[in-house]
């Protein structure tokens, strides 16, 4: 992905703009971060530079970044908190700024030791919000897709089936190529966060959904290029699937938590409820730490308590 940033030209000097552009290109290229992550870091650092310009009273330059102290970063985070940013967003802001500072330090332009030592805001533990199995099954069929051309309906159903049937992140699903689906394959090799590779089983119903899309797609699908295409033949963007889910929420009366990522949560929660063990689910999701996967035990317990409260005569 290439980033051409023009919006902040009025509140950052060219030396800083050029280095920021180089940093973003490194994130997208060499480090292979997901598009969504790079876009978030671009937005976060843009907000920071706008804040810094107001803070120092002139367009920010590299020399100003070199002079940053933890108190300056705390002032920025406090400003963002006043604007309504939550702990998770503040943590991402700080992670992006640290990454930019490390980039500048590697080039010998700043000494980032002081600023990067600042601790991230404490993150509240929140439970994932899965759909019910009935809701998940309903929205992963081509028939559920609304007022779409047949090939687009098949495409949406295939993508959503991969999220729920394989537990993929949306960026992982949209990065798949026809070469990932050789004839007769029963599994997918997925490269996820941190370039960690995992193998996930491929359910027959998911294979069928993908095959239907490939047959109906009006564009030629190159073996090593992204398989899921937009209406004009370019790579399908996550925002399209997110908008589709928004339409499905309205059409089927689904809760606000019915998002593409909720299908991945549903995959894990339903496996756990069906007797799957945490270690296996950890591998299927590509979590580096078991503690990340253990949050789903809380989801399952919460669902059990909800059923108990609604059904038990003494509740």
Curated annotation (Swiss-Prot):
Q: Does the keyword Cytoplasm apply?
A: yes
Gene3D superfamilies linked to this entry: 1.10.150.130, Intergrase catalytic core
This protein's GO CC annotations: cytoplasm
Catalytic residues, chain numbering: 169, 193, 261, 264, 287, 296
| Residue stretches making up the Tyr recombinase domain | 126-309
Keyword NADP tagged: no
Its subcellular locations are: Cytoplasm
- What's one Pfam family the UniProt record gives for this protein? Phage_integrase
Molecular function terms from GO: DNA binding; tyrosine-based site-specific recombinase activity
Q: Which family does it belong to?
A: Belongs to the 'phage' integrase family. XerC subfamily.
Protein name in the entry: Tyrosine recombinase XerC
Species of origin: Agrobacterium fabrum (strain C58 / ATCC 33970)
Q: Give the gene symbol.
A: xerC
């Amino acid at each position: 992905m290439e980033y051409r940033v023009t919006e902040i030209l009025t509140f950052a000097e060219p030396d800083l703009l050029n280095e920021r552009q180089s940093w973003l290109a490194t994130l997208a290229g060499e480090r292979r971060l997901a598009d969504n992550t790079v876009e978030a870091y671009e937005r976060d650092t843009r907000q920071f530079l706008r804040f810094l310009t107001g803070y120092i009273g002139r367009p920010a330059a590299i020399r100003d970044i070199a002079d940053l102290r933890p108190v300056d970063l705390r002032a920025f985070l406090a400003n963002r908190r006043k604007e309504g940013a939550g702990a998770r967003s503040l943590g991402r802001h700080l992670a992006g700024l640290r990454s930019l500072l490390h980039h500048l330090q590697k080039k010998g332009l700043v000494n980032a030791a002081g600023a990067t030592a600042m601790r991230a805001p404490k993150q509240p533990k929140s439970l994932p919000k899965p759909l019910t199995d009935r809701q998940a099954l309903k929205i992963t069929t081509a028939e559920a897709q609304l007022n779409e051309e047949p090939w687009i309906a098949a495409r949406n159903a295939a993508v959503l089936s991969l999220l729920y049937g394989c537990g993929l992140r949306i960026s992982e699903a949209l990065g798949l190529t026809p070469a990932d689906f050789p004839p007769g394959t029963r599994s997918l090799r997925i490269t996820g966060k941190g370039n960690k590779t995992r193998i996930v089983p491929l359910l027959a119903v998911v294979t069928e959904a993908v095959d239907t899309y490939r047959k109906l797609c009006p564009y030629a699908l190159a073996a090593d290029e992204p398989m899921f295409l937009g209406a004009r033949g370019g790579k399908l963007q996550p925002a399209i699937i997110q908008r589709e889910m928004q339409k499905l929420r309205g059409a089927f009366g689904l809760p606000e938590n019915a998002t593409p990522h909720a299908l991945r949560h549903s995959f894990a929660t339903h496996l756990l409820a069906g007797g799957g063990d945490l270690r296996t689910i950890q591998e299927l999701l590509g979590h580096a730490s078991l503690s990340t996967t253990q949050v789903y035990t809380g989801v399952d317990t919460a669902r059990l308590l909800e059923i108990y409260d609604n059904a038990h005569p003494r509740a």
